[in-house]
Amino acid sequence: MRKNRIIMTHGINVNAPLLASYVNGNYNVELYADGTKIRFGNVDEFKPDFPENIDVCITRKCDGGCPYCYEGCTINGSHGLLLDGNGELINWMQSLHPGTELALNGNSLDHPDLERALILLREKGVFVNMTINQMHLAPNFAKLLDWQRKGLIWGLGVSLVDSESDVFYTCIKHFKNVVIHTIAGIITVEDLINLQSIKPKVLVLGYKNIGRARNYSLNHADEIMHNIEELKVNLPMFIANEYFSGVCFDNLAIDQLDVKNLLFKNNEEGWNQFYMGDDGSHTMYIDAVEDRYAKNSCMSKEERYNINDKTVDEMFKHIRDTYVNDSETSPEVSEVSSDESKS
């Protein structure tokens, strides 16, 4: 869930407009229009009171049929609750803090209450990043563009399916703050070479061996491992030659690709600036369909907890108390992430 990307120290000029500036616990956060986020503070360790980013599954209804879908979405899947009986945001959404980023995953476009919820979230100062499957981009092009222009969605994540689609490239150039979502083990080197023509931001997600992805990995284990090894070989070259305007990873991809040794070998300072922290330290996951929350979307059923009437602060405190150890980020290092929606 966590995205880690190219580093920027606080004080360096950021050309993009400042979207939000807020205090979270004992440190400050600045969020910029290009997806850059900077944390800074004169403290021994950063201790947030609320999550900066929340991955949210609002529906499991999707006609994409991806064989490696970790959420197990189907055409007959259920929607999560977003609004109460009065057409207002449900309790946990009401408790969100201004500046918080929500990453809506799955085929969120199919949710009947989505637009109303987006309007209310915008009024609260919450930034919504939406991830969609590439197959849903062209059919919903006008709607998505209108929502972004109105500020209902901030970032758009597009899960890559076909890197040779002319329609995809025609549509994508009209959006700002777009991140192309790829999956380690699924994405090929050829796909990344094709993407280079538009020089996008690219998010590499780890392969989540849950949901339908578990069965897919059993039948395609060699292919998945081959793609991961090929990515390891070529990733340093892609970054050094600036194939993309930015490359970021979630923590699972960092482990699977051994990013620390691959890109930061003998560069502990660079790694400390790059790494945004463990899942649960500044982030969490909410399953609005099942009304449960967890450290991240990979957690087992036993490690997903009922929301009931909890606020986001209460859920996040539980996550941190349960999973986060005493080792936090050095206050002398400002951290940057590029957050769009997570898949």
Range-by-range predicted roles:
Residues L152-K310, M315:
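Radical SAM enzyme [4Fe-4S]-AdoMet core and its adjacent flexible, acidic
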Residues N296-S343:
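Membrane-interface junctions of multi-pass transporters
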Residues D44-G85, S297:
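Canonical Radical SAM [4Fe-4S] cluster-binding loop centered on the CxxxCxxC motif
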Residues N53, G72-D84, H97-H111, L121-N140, ...:
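Core AdoMet radical
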Residues T36, P67, D291-R292:
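Residue-level signal for well-ordered, solvent-exposed loop/turn and beta-edge residues enriched
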Residues E88-N91, D113-E123, K143, V167-T170, ...:
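Alpha-helical scaffolding segments of alpha/beta enzyme cores, especially the outer helices
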Residues M1-V56, C73, E268-W271, P331-S341:
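N-terminal [4Fe-4S]-dependent radical SAM core
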Residues G65, N105, V289-E290:
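Residue-level recognition of short loop/turn positions
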